[in-house]
């Protein structure tokens, strides 16, 4: 945790990566009343990964390093000419296999926050991580427990709403597919028998009964990677709200919630990366900068999270739960601004599943969502689509 000469630090980071360019929340429903607390210390032994899992996590976390782009965008925005009107403090660290960054604006004391924050993030990770074999979600998937904590319960409720809105295009029960294709640290199957897996996939195959998860079949498994980091940003934001912070930015693995205003009294500035293969350094090549406040933001794309199998096929991480097949489309990335970061995270994934035209039709029916889509035309040229509200957020 630091305060003081943030401009010097920002420029040092930017130089190291040869770039000088940047990148009441709450979950959709309240915390599950009466549910047991999230995993406590001693309940989970921490993450243990095989070499294959480490390789998959490094390759598969498409947004884990996006925090650097966000941090640079925030810090460098404060390095422009003119006085910095209010002090700000930066807290950063590691969580969920990636990084987190928090910027707090104001004079309120921030002593001891990092320790409390790391404790919160530890509890979330030991709840929802698929890479941690002792997490609550991992044990639920193995059938060792059916008891939900508030983190998993809230994600399931939010996901269920979006699954119903999308006719099942978005679905968190795709764990058998993501595992078969090697996106959850499991060893990929060269030619998965998709038909045999589809019988265990479907949002209607799970329901919450009190604090228990009821499955229609023991082999039904959940993958929260499309919503967990956004939900984590929301949890941190709610915690900061409870402490009285009015102006802050929370970023977890690239998913963002911004409250109030930055140190200069303006919107929080966030950079969106160009969705080109090889663009592995967040902030090195920006598509656009936008300003947000009191909203969540997330970007989904297929330009980082993929692998080439032994047959030379590019396998992307986005699946259509109805067919079980990886999605093939000309939509390269989808950035969504929503009421919460969890919603933005999930709706961004939904757009990638639906593709360009269906996403546009869906967004036109949803005035509560703003989006910035990047797609490729038949000649390979990059094109963009923005909702009317997103156009007003773009910074010139």
Where are these regions (language model features)?
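Basic polycationic patches enriched in arginine
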Residues: 2, 9-11, 21, 29, ...
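Short, Lys/Arg-enriched N-terminal segments with co-localized hydrophobic residues
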Residues: 46-58
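Hydrophobic core
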Residues: 74-76
């Amino acid at each position: 945790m630091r305060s003081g000469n943030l401009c010097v630090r920002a420029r040092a980071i930017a130089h190291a990566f040869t770039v000088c360019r940047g990148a009441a929340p709450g979950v959709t429903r309240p915390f599950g009343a009466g549910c047991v607390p999230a995993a406590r210390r001693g309940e989970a032994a921490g993450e243990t990964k095989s070499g294959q899992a480490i390789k998959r996590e490094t390759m598969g976390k498409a947004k884990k390093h996006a925090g650097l782009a966000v941090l640079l965008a925030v810090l460098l925005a404060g390095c422009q000419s003119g006085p910095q009107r209010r002090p700000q403090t930066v807290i950063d660290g590691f969580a969920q296999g990636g990084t987190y960054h928090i910027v707090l604006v104001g004079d309120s004391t921030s002593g001891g926050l990092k320790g409390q924050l790391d404790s919160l993030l530890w509890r979330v990770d030991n709840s929802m991580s698929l890479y941690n074999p002792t997490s609550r979600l991992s044990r639920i998937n193995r059938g060792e427990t059916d008891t939900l904590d508030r983190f998993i319960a809230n994600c399931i409720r939010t996901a269920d709403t979006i699954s119903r809105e999308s006719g099942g295009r978005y679905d968190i029960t795709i764990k058998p597919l993501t595992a078969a294709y090697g996106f959850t640290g499991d060893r990929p199957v060269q030619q998965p028998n998709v038909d045999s897996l589809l019988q265990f996939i479907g949002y209607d195959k799970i329901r919450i009964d009190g604090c228990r998860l009821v499955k229609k079949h023991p082999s039904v498994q959940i993958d929260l990677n499309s919503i967990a980091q956004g939900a984590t940003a929301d949890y941190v934001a709610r915690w900061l709200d409870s402490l009285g912070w009015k102006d802050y930015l929370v970023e977890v693995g690239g998913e963002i919630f911004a409250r109030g205003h930055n140190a200069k009294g303006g919107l929080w500035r966030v950079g969106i990366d160009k969705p080109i293969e090889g663009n592995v350094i967040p902030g090195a090549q920006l598509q656009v900068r936008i300003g947000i406040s009191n909203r969540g933001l997330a970007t989904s794309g297929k330009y980082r999270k993929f692998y080439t199998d032994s047959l030379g096929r590019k396998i992307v991480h986005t699946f259509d739960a109805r067919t079980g097949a990886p999605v093939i489309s000309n939509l390269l990335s989808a950035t969504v601004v929503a009421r919460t970061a969890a919603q933005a995270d999930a709706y961004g994934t939904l757009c990638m599943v639906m593709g360009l035209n269906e996403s546009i039709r869906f967004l036109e029916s949803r005035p509560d969502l703003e989006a910035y889509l990047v797609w490729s035309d038949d000649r390979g040229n990059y094109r963009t689509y923005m909702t009317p509200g997103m156009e007003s957020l773009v910074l010139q």
